[in-house]
Regions:
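Adenosyl-5′-phosphate
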Residues: 5-6, 16, 162-164, 191-401
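A mobile, often basic/glycine-rich helix-loop segment
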Residues: 173-198
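Active-site-adjacent "lid"/gating segments
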Residues: 1-50, 59-80, 85-86, 93-132
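Glycine-rich loop motifs involved in handling phospho/adenylate chemistry
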Residues: 48-56, 96, 270-271, 320-324
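Short acidic/histidine-rich active-site segments
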Residues: 160-170, 174-176
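Short beta-strand segments
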Residues: 50-53, 78-83, 118-120, 164-168, ...
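Structural preference for long, well-ordered alpha-helical segments in enzyme cores
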Residues: 30-38, 60-65, 108, 133, ...
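Phosphate/ATP-binding catalytic cores across multiple sugar-kinase/actin-like superfamilies
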Residues: 28-50, 155-159, 163, 254, ...
Length: 401
């Protein structure tokens, strides 16, 4: 910035390089880079803790951190997990979330002998904090997984100032279902399967906007910038494209959410899997090696094989948890119904009122596909619309449509 204004300059970009190491060398070097990234991010003159879900990513961070604490005579590591009131009672397994975290958290906390805290969130409070989460984000983002991370960070901050967590491992090492699909060509962001479904709830005045065409163009613009090597296999090209899209779009959204929800509560969130050296190395690992044994994050699992329990290593990926409690559903339905009854609501300049009423009457079941990611269905879509109305009002947004 100077007297002539602001100038934007890109200071870093991925580079495509030939990967020359065999599987054994790659596994060993990857483990070394992971440990180094975690240990460097443990350096602090204030209390440090880790988030622990019992999944692969947070478990390895917590394992390395606990060993470092022990080696440096810092006592036991504090680890923190999150859950919602009575979630075990109402939990329903699905393709993306085959089991809840509780069993795995206890197993891993015992394995590393951490001082573990399980933070249980009240479902009504979760709904009531949608506004605070929206204000912390400056945007409507990810519904109740915003407010839950906000409340979780608020509780963790009572015990620590820095928290390490496992975000970015899925984007960097191929943890999402779309990484294992066989694409001839990638025409659309792989996490936007519900785009047409979303268009169906738009207000009639904007329903004809070329939203799908715009999204496809943005996707293709990004793909045109993907660093590649000449002569690579189609599979390796697609892996680079998927990784690039995830790093530039999906991961940025998650990092933005993480940074804003934690820092709104004066908690510094650190993400070792986003370490620059680690990302640069992982980007050039061939697809068959990265998805070792045809599994999501196959190589990452193999690099941790001798250090973590096999149960943890082989546990299927489970996303950040959402509440399944009907109390939450009733709370957000009431909040959205209050918006429907408000003659000054701005929401209906964007969203069709009849579709919203139908969503309330069916408790979100009229919207069957994930709004974002893999779990944002039903009550989460309702919560997102509440966030949208909050944002439109709190920031006095004027729509020129």
């Amino acid at each position: 910035y100077n007297k002539n204004g602001i100038k934007l300059r890109q200071y870093w970009e991925l580079e495509a390089k030939e990967h020359t190491q065999d599987l054994g060398q790659t596994t060993k070097h990857l483990r070394e880079l992971l440990v180094d990234a975690i240990e460097r991010q443990l350096v602090s003159d204030v209390p440090v803790c880790t988030f622990l879900s019992g999944g692969l990513d947070s478990s390895f961070i917590s394992y390395v951190a606990a060993k470092a604490f022990e080696r440096n005579n810092k006592g036991k590591l504090n680890t923190f997990s999150i859950d919602n009131t009575d979630n075990e009672k109402y939990f329903k397994a699905n393709e993306f979330q085959p089991n809840s975290d509780a069993y795995w958290v206890v197993k891993m906390a015992g394995y590393i002998k951490s001082n573990h805290y399980n933070v249980i969130l009240d479902n009504t409070t979760l709904a009531n904090y949608l506004k605070e989460a929206t204000l912390a984000s400056d945007l409507p983002l990810m519904a109740d997984i915003d407010s839950s991370l906000y409340l979780f960070s608020k509780e963790v901050r009572k015990h620590a100032t820095v928290a390490l967590s496992g975000e970015c491992a899925d984007e960097v090492f191929g943890g999402y279902p779309w990484y294992t699909k066989d694409y001839e060509n990638i025409e659309m962001f792989p996490w936007q399967d519900s785009l047409n479904h979303r268009k169906n709830i738009l207000a009639k005045s904007i329903a004809d906007l070329p939203i799908e065409e715009y999204a496809k163009q943005m996707c293709q613009d990004s793909i045109s910038k993907v660093p590649k090597l000449k002569g690579e296999s189609k599979r390796d090209e697609r892996m680079r494209e998927l990784t690039y899209l995830n790093l530039k779009w999906f991961m940025i959204t998650l990092l933005n959410r993480k940074d804003r929800m934690t820092m709104a509560n004066s908690l510094e969130g650190r993400v070792p899997y986003a370490d620059k050296t680690l990302v640069e190395y992982a980007y050039n690992i061939p697809a068959d090696m990265k998805l070792l044994h045809g599994r999501e994050k196959g190589l990452l699992r193999e690099s941790m094989r001798t250090l973590l329990p096999d149960e943890i290593i082989d546990r299927k990926k489970s996303p950040y948890p959402k509440t399944h409690n009907p109390i939450y559903t009733k709370a957000v339905c009431k909040m959205l119904n209050d918006i429907v009854q408000d003659p000054n609501a701005k929401l209906f300049q964007i969203v069709d009122k009849e579709a919203v009423v139908n969503m309330i009457n069916t408790q979100g079941k009229s919207f069957t596909k994930p709004w974002f990611g893999q779990l944002m269905t039903g009550p989460q879509v309702i919560a997102y619309l509440i966030q949208l109305e909050t944002w439109l009002n709190e920031y006095n947004v004027k729509l020129d449509i």
